């Protein structure tokens, strides 16, 4: 049994059709070279580990509650809940569902494949052998600091993003110049 993996830079496109065409061409060439061998399949993986996107935030305690002291208590609970979601897959499922609500809305609004993105992110949450929460929360000084890293293969050109009027409008509202590559 042999698996051959390719890494294709599709730039700002999602590139599924292009990648599958490349893989089919490679499979045909392999069939020519090794006619006695069976090729089970030649298809892309939606587990986009080479397309990681990160977001971070800093929230002052006073923004979390009626005052700084209550905000600090809330920050500590958020941090503890995030740590617990790393240990317990039942908590992680609900923790990540909340994250996915926002991600899937943006993915759908821009005409991207919500199922592909969702599958990739959930696989990433289980990459260490246990399904875990996707966020990291820490207390730094008088702030709650959060970080999220997920595989996010989405398109800003091609496919539905350029055909569907609502997807085009959604992309126009985003300031894509803020993206750091």
Label each PLM-derived region with a short phrase.
Residues 1-6:
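Short, conserved phosphate-binding/catalytic loop or strand-edge motifs used
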Residues 11:
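A domain-level signal for the structural core that forms small-molecule/cofactor-binding pockets
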Residues 14, 19-159:
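Glycine-rich anion/phosphate-binding loop at the beta-strand->alpha-helix junction
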Residues 25-27, 170-173:
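Short, well-ordered amphipathic alpha-helical segments that serve as non-catalytic structural scaffolds
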Residues 151-155, 171-176:
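Short beta-alpha connecting loops at secondary-structure transitions
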Residues 179-181:
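Conserved small/polar residues in nucleotide/adenosyl-binding loops
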């Amino acid at each position: 049994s042999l698996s051959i993996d390719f890494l294709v830079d599709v730039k700002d496109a999602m590139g599924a059709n292009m990648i599958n065409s490349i893989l089919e061409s490679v499979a045909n060439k392999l069939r020519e070279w090794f006619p006695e061998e069976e090729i089970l399949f030649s298809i892309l993986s939606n587990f986009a580990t080479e397309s990681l996107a990160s977001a971070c935030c800093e929230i002052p305690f006073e923004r979390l509650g009626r005052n700084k002291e209550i905000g600090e208590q809330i920050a500590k609970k958020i941090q503890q809940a995030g740590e617990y979601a790393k240990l317990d897959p039942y908590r992680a499922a609900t923790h990540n569902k909340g994250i996915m609500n926002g991600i899937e809305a943006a993915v759908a609004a821009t005409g991207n494949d919500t199922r592909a993105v969702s599958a990739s992110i959930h696989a990433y949450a289980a990459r260490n052998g246990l399904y875990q929460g996707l966020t990291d929360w820490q207390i730094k000084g008088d702030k709650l600091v959060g970080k999220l890293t997920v595989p996010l293969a989405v398109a800003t050109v091609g496919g539905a993003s350029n055909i569907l009027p609502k997807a085009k409008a959604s992309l126009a509202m985003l300031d894509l110049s803020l993206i750091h590559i």
